[in-house]
């Protein structure tokens, strides 16, 4: 048994298909594998709208499931998403040793979010992991897919890993009756922008307006002229045009 803790970064696809429905829970399955094989407990984290789909995290044995949901954070790109997730991880009371994500997103193969999380946390990142070969209290050993080869690497903790869609689970990973029963007494924990420090939130959404849940960046802001000022402006422009015409004559 290792005195370690893992975190699964979960994001369900906007539109579920036969191809991506199972892939999105690969981080869950990986963390359950860690729990069954090494007795490493884990939590789940997502930046998305609340959905009952996330209750599946508890079915797989997660201790806690956090969903960061706030209108201030809606519509964020991958870089800002990674920054928010990383800030939550760094500000939480738990030190995670292994942070697990997945290679695919709604837009195809990407490592932008997990690599961004690793970058903001200033910790190692292993991309496109195909197999977990070994794990000790000090290091993680795995194989990742290069464009033409499979490379075996090792990393110290903490580390962020991104699972390839060809990841090889040693056996079928599924919810246990024990975890499913306990899941009934667990609730998804909603995290709002109030959790984060004010200066961080302001750095994420500088000069923005929120209209119908969408963020609009303010490029320039000025007051509308009054009717009186508008008439004066029109008079000035008219006189200027007359002077220009006179000078041309």
What are these regions (language model features)?
Residues 8, 44-46, 67, 101, ...:
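Structural beta-sheet core signal
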Residues 49-50, 104-110:
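Gly/Ser/Thr-rich loops at beta-strand to alpha-helix junctions
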Residues 107-125:
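Short Gly/Thr/Asp-enriched flexible loops that form oxyanion-binding sites at enzyme active sites
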Residues 132-249:
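Electrostatically charged, flexible surface regions
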């Amino acid at each position: 048994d290792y005195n370690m803790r893992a975190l699964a970064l979960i994001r369900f696809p906007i539109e579920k298909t036969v191809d991506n429905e199972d892939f999105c829970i690969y981080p869950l399955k990986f963390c359950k594998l860690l729990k069954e094989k090494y007795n490493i407990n884990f939590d789940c984290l997502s930046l998305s709208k609340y959905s009952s789909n996330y209750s599946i995290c508890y079915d797989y044995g997660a201790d806690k499931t956090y969903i960061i949901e706030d209108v201030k954070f809606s519509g964020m790109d991958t870089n800002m998403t990674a920054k928010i997730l990383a800030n939550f991880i760094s500000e939480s009371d738990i030190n995670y040793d292994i942070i697990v994500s997945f290679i695919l997103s709604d837009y195809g193969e990407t490592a932008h979010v997990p690599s961004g999380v690793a970058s903001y946390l200033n910790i190692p990142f292993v991309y496109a992991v195909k197999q977990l070969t070994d794990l000790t209290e000090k290091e993680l050993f795995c194989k990742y897919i290069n464009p033409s080869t499979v490379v075996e690497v090792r990393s110290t903790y903490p580390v962020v890993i991104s699972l390839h869609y060809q990841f090889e689970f040693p056996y079928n990973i599924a919810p246990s009756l024990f975890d499913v029963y306990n899941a009934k007494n667990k609730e998804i924990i909603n995290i709002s922008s109030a959790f984060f420090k004010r200066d961080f939130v302001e750095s994420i959404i500088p000069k923005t307006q929120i209209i119908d849940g969408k963020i609009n960046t303010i490029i320039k802001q000025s007051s509308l002229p009054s009717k009186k000022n508008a008439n004066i402006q029109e008079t000035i422009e008219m006189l200027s045009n007359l002077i220009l015409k006179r000078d041309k004559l």
